[in-house]
């Protein structure tokens, strides 16, 4: 099992989750997916559900769904909903029993609040998962990636590596190789994958504690 988090919203966690899931399926692994909390509709869950051909209901895969495209704590407040962490845990345990390998995707970045005194990073810790961090290749990513990795480690969470999702064409990013080296050197973390698109990617599966 693995938790897919990222340096920001819109960084490509859903896209990378789907690609990773399809790779594992092609290797004969019975892989499932879960997005514990989704704000702004059901689009992310629906996309990965479709890509992986999962038969689970949306509620099973996404136990907390909020309509407003805001931080979960704010969206829940506006919608007058109480986010039940035990409900998330129960859904997680059920899917964990059903699948050989489970990909759990976060919402936004690691410091996004789910509810009072409970961040995305706290959810990763609560579910006792290791994680990968999805990042971008362009200017600013060194800072964002290192801060994210450091925050997770201070919470006692193991970071297996970073996957660069090229939301900007990497060939148009000046000195991107030096950027990636800096992430690894100063963040003391390995870049285990680079995703250009659905057909052009590399992910080092040996780093993911596969069954």
Swiss-Prot record:
Reactions catalysed according to its record: (7R,8S)-7,8-diammoniononanoate + CO2 + ATP = (4R,5S)-dethiobiotin + ADP + phosphate + 3 H(+)
Binding site for substrate: 39
Active site, renumbered: 35
Residues annotated for ATP binding in this entry: 10-15, 44, 105-108, 165-166
InterPro entries: DTB_synth_BioD, P-loop_NTPase
Organism: Methanococcus vannielii (strain ATCC 35089 / DSM 1224 / JCM 13029 / OCM 148 / SB)
Designated name of the protein: ATP-dependent dethiobiotin synthetase BioD
Any single Gene Ontology cellular-component annotation: cytosol
Cofactor: Mg(2+)
Gene Ontology molecular function, alphabetical: ATP binding; dethiobiotin synthase activity; magnesium ion binding
Purpose of the protein: Catalyzes a mechanistically unusual reaction, the ATP-dependent insertion of CO2 between the N7 and N8 nitrogen atoms of 7,8-diaminopelargonic acid (DAPA, also called 7,8-diammoniononanoate) to form a ureido ring.
Enzyme class of the recorded protein, top EC level: ligase
Binding-site residues for Mg(2+), renumbered to this chain: 14, 44, 105
């Amino acid at each position: 099992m693995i938790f897919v988090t990222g340096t920001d919203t819109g960084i490509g966690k859903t896209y990378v989750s789907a690609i990773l899931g399809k790779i594992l399926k092609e290797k004969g692994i019975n892989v499932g997916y879960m997005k514990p909390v989704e704000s702004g509709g059901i689009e992310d869950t629906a996309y990965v559900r479709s890509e992986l051909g999962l038969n689970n209901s949306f509620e099973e895969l996404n136990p907390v769904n909020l309509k407003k495209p805001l931080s979960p704590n704010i969206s829940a407040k506006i919608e007058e909903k109480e986010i039940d962490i035990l409900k998330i845990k129960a859904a997680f345990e059920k899917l964990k029993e059903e699948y050989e390998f489970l990909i759990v995707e976060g919402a936004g970045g690691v410091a996004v609040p789910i509810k009072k005194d409970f961040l995305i990073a706290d959810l990763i810790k609560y579910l006792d998962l290791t994680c990968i961090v999805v990042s971008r290749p362009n200017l600013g990513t060194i800072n964002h990636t290192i801060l994210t990795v450091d925050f997770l480690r201070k919470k006692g969470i193991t970071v297996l590596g970073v996957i660069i999702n090229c939301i900007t064409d990497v060939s148009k990013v000046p000195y991107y190789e030096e950027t990636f080296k800096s992430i690894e050197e100063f963040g003391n973390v390995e870049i285990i994958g680079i995703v250009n698109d659905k057909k052009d990617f590399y992910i080092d599966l040996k780093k993911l504690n596969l069954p």
